[in-house]
Structures are given as structure tokens and as C-alpha cells.
Amino acid sequence: MNPSTHVSSNGPTTPPHGPHTTFLPPTSPAPSTSSVAAATLCSPQRQAVSRYSGWSTEYTQWHSDLTTELLWHAHPRQVPMDEALAAAAAASYQVNPQHPANRYRHYEFQTLSLGTSEVDELLNCCAEETTCGGTQSTVLTNATNTTSCGGAVAGSSNAGPAGASAACDLDAELAGLETSAADFEQLRRLCAPLAIDTRCNLCAIISICLKQDCDQSWLLEYSLLCFKCSYAPRAALSTLIIMSEFTHLLQQHFSDLRIDDLFRHHVLTVFDFHLHFFINRCFEKQVGDAVDNENVTLNHLAVVRAMVMGEDTVPYNKPRRHPQQKQKNNPYHVEVPQELIDNFLEHSSPSRDRFVQLLFYMWAGTGVMSTTPLTELTHTKFARLDALSTASEREDARMMMEEEEDEEGGEKGGDDPGRHNGGGTSGGFSESTLKKNVGPIYLCPVPAFFTKNQTSTVCLLCELMACSYYDNVVLRELYRRVVSYCQNNVKMVDRIQLVLADLLRECTSPLGAAHEDVARCGLEAPTSPGGDSDYHGLSGVDGALARPDPVFCHVLRQAGVTGIYKHFFCDPQCAGNIRVTNEAVLFGHLHPHHVQEVKLAICHDNYYISRLPRRVWLCITLFKAFQITKRTYKGKVHLADFMRDFTQLLENCDIKLVDPTYVIDKYV
């Protein structure tokens, strides 16, 4: 049974937006719309307690144990070496940092350990086991061949004593081979959800849950989460919120399901959520040719995998053009479900919830917050992460003892396949070191941390778009003030510098030295000067209403002039987030008397449409991959071909940015 198969509903097949077959999110079997309504009406008690509106700080709190555990799973890890190998590797890096064996040490974000993904054993979904044996042998072989060949090249190209020393340092060569092989093995396990023939684990879990969801209440709330996901920026904070709320929905409706074990035993990883909610968007109605859609997904997965593995080349395949299949309309123009959105806005109000504390907690003590101390928050987070690592080591030791006992009595009790295939252990977490200084980088759409020219692969302004309705309004006001600052032909960088200075002066209550941990001030979004908490009136026209608060100004200081310039005018990833984000929907809190009505409308219409097609997001991800990948001759040829198509794509999507050829090597 394929869990991602969309089954036609038995309800009405002509929604308000035109005649087409109505589909529900990936289910098996799919409940009819009439059964959903009947079950809802027959369960007044369940309806009264269901007040889930999505994207709320009630379900994702920075100090909760679940949040810390999710962040722990999203951190990179490094396999430790013994002292002798570590000393040899350090000496090799000092002598020849460009050696292929040392390039992977430079990419600290790559070395991590995560277990395999096996929904089958834990949930008894089906007998088929998810494996990646072929991928494993290929990756390890390539890693060994690259290092070996690289050593020969390095030895022949380096002239003088330094080159001779690097070529003859056998201990360093062995250290590089052992570390790279171990890291690649753990990266292979992490990338299991990104394989071509691996099913979506979330779809498998959803199919099981729907069989137990007798009154369809869980389906309605899951549909609301998917609806809000379509209007959320693709940022690390968005991924964390989705993971947390999805987990809470499972815990709330299926108490017998040990959701903690899904992450602890690596049945689910962060890339399962990337795949389901952002890359493949399994809940979205299929538009166009099924094979073309599959190719878009597989290409996107290959690019993400290449960034995680730190490969030298970007898996870019120039799209084939079929003249006979030309479309008269712009294929990149998306019709949004305006009637459904209007209905949602009519029965909702912008929430004052703000995820700034969670944002600071995520990136405290990392390179993303390099100029922001956050000492107390950093100390708290690191202590919690260390506690989780210690608990994981104890769990590993317990599981190993149980496996040894099972082996001793092997023929008498038989083998338990769940323990020997990696599904019951932590997959080597106890043998790896958490890279706390990098942060939960695998929550990001670009799962690699780089810095270049005062920018990084984590855009704080994109993260801020997922924080609150208020932050989106102030960001839009900031953009308006920059582009309309004066009538003279002043460069954008100068405009940003001047506007930023004005904004910092306008900040009503600047932070003093006593507020070193600025996150304490971001519990709720500020109200208007009159005390009104209704943000429908906030607009960029009234500067008093859209005035930034101290927390917002602090984030602007951290981003800097260059980061603001990159976000608004240079980066296609940021431009895509600006295009798709609808803060009124994302942070809309449904009125209590219309919660069930709106959820039913969303589930029935099944319009989970993003304002940018998945192919556009694929090209944006390719652009980001080219930015962080080392330039080789083959890579330069691919980049030239890609840039010609990419600039045309931006024009077709009506996205106006600084020419990408100017910024492809300038920022990350």
C-alpha cells in the first residue's frame, strides 16, 4: 500500500473554485466529507475542547523538553578521534589545508550521526524494510577513492618542503581516511529519507493514524497545519514549529502512540519533515504530469543530499524543453484560493504570539548570533543538550547489554530484528560529539553553515518572518522606507544604512546593559500606542503603528546592513519567502465559534497551494547549492548553464532582484 496515494473523496466533487475532483490529504482509506461533518456534529464534547489554531506558542515553547530534544536531533555531530589521530590530523591541516582529507574537517557541519529510518518495525505498517545498502557502499567507495586520489594530486602539485611533508605524512593520511569514512557512514544514515526509493515516513504514520481517527478530528487539525504551512517562510524556525505541532497533535489524539520514541529511535528525522511539508508537499493536490512532479522531487532531494554530504558538484540537470507542449499561460503563475483565504480571515484575528524567545534559544551560542552574547540562554541550552547526550549514552549502553544477552541465549529466544537493524538503538549517537557551536543547522532549507562577507546561510530576517504577525508588518515597513527614502539616485546599501540609523533612534525603549539576554523582552508582540491588540489596522502607512521594538532592532543589528541588503534585494531564497508568506493566515487565531467550520472548509476544499511552484523552489535550492560548493571546471560549466535559465525563471515569476551573477560568489 502506498501511503502517498490520493484517493478521491465521496463528498461533493465541485468546490466553489471550479469543477474538479476533490482530494484529501494523503490517506488510506480516505474519509468522505459527509462522514467528517457527521462525526464532528456527533461529537460535541470533542468539538468543544478542540481549539487548535496552528502556529501558536502554546504548542512550541522554547523551554519545553520536546523543543530541546528536536533541536538536539537537528545538530550536526562529529566522530571523535583518539589523541594520536587528532594530533596527526591537526598537523596535516596546518601543513596542507586544501588536502581533500582536510576539506571535510573544514565543513564542521557535515560530521554527524543519525540512525536509520524504519517506520515498519515500530508501527507495524508493513513488512518491507527501508534500507540503503547500495547507497552505503557507493558513498564509502567514493570517499575512499577521492581521498586517495587527492593525496596523490596534492603530493605532486605542492612544491617545496611543505608539499613534501604533506605527501609523506602517513599518520595524517590514515587519520583523514578513518575520519572521513566514519563521517560518511553516519551521513549516509542521516540521508536515508533522501534516497530515491525511500517512501515518506510521515505519510506512513498519517495512514495509520487515520485508521484510528474515528471522528476525523485529527484529520481536521492536520489539514489546518498543512494549510498554514503553505503560507510559512522556509526557515529553520518554521521547520521546528511544524515538527513540534505535528508531534503535539499525535500526542493529543493518540495517547497510546509513543511519539518520543519516533525521534529517539530515529524512525523520524528532520529530513522527513523537509520532504513531507516542503520538498514534496505530499498533502498538495497533484498538478501536471506525475512523472515530471516526481523528477522535481528527486532532483530537490539530490541537491539537499549533496549539500549535507559536502559533495564537490551540484546535481544539476538542465531541464529538457518540449516545443510541442508549450503552455499559453505562465506556468509559474499560481492561482491562490482567495475565497478560502477570505473565509479564514473573516473568522480569525492576528495573534500576539511571538517566537522570538525560541529563535534566540535556537541560535544562542552559535555563529548565527556571533555578536549577540545571550550568555544565560546559551548556558541553559548547552546544559540541556549535554543532559540529552548523557541520557542517550546510557540508553545505548542499556541496549547493547540487552543485545549481548540476546546473543548469549540466541537459539533459545531467537533474534529480535528490531534491535539488530538499527531501529532500536540510537544509531551511534554515543560515539559522536554534538557540534553545539554550529546549531540546529539541519532545520534550515540550506542544511550547511557558511559565512561570507558578513552574511550566512541562516538569514535572520527570514527567521523573523516566522516569529509573529508584528515582525512581518515591521519588516514590510522597513522595506518601504528603504525604497522610498529619498528621490535621489542613492545606492540601496546607503539607503539601508540611513534608514537603519533612523529606526534605531526611533526605538522607544532601548535595551540597557541589564538586559543582556534580549530574549526576555520578546514574550509577546507589542500593542499599538492606544493599547489595541487587533493588528488588522497595522500597515506601512502609519509609522507609529509599525514602529520596531527593542527586540526587532536587536535582530537588525545582528543582521547588519549587508544582511538586510541581501534579504531584500539579492537572495532568491529570501525573495521566495517574501512571496509565499501570508502573516494574516500564518498567525491567524480562529474565533472559538468558527474553529470547526473553518477546519471543515479547509479539509473539504483541499487547496494547499503555495504561491511558488515546487520547480521554482528547486531552482532556488540549486542557486544556494552553487553558492556554497567549491568551483571546479565541471561546476563552472554547470553554473553558466544554470544561471541563464535561472535569470529567465526569476523574470517569469516577476521576482526583481540584483542580477544573480553579481551575488552568486558574493554572499551565501
Curated annotation (Swiss-Prot):
Q: Where is the composition biased (Basic and acidic residues)?
A: 392-401, 410-419
* Location of the region described as Disordered in the Swiss-Prot/TrEMBL record: 1-35, 392-430
What residues does Zn(2+) 2 bind to? C459, C462, H567, C574
Q: Name one GO cellular component term.
A: host cell cytoplasm
Subcellular localization is given as: Host cytoplasm; Host nucleus
Protein name from the UniProt record = Packaging protein UL32 homolog
One GO MF term? zinc ion binding
Annotated Pfam families: Herpes_env
